[in-house]
Amino acid sequence: MNKVILMGRLTRDPQVRYTQGQDSMAIARFTLAVDRRGRKQEGQQDADFPSCVAFGKSAEFVEKYVHQGTKIVLTGRIQTGSYTNKDNIKVYTTEVIAEDIEFAESKVGSQKDPEEQEDIKN
């Protein structure tokens, strides 16, 4: 089974492009800042920054409603791949493919109290 659930904030606005052709499809790429459990000795939170990709309707949703700092819950899967770059070096990739994206807090909740969260289904 390959299933991932992440909650975090976008590190920057998503990059969205559309495939060419008659049935063009949206592809959104973004990075999430996901806090790790526990804290460093200095009291700061450690975080991971997974690269994420959404396709189709999910990508259109991301383009329209999700921006830098937006807190989301993403359900998806991990996908690995590789390619050869322009210097003829093989590069390995790991991405989270988004299957469902939800808001982790309402606009009002994000401005007032982050403990009060409201989920909005995509």
Regions found by a protein language model. Give the residues of each.
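Active-site/binding-pocket entry motifs
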Residues: R12, D35-G38
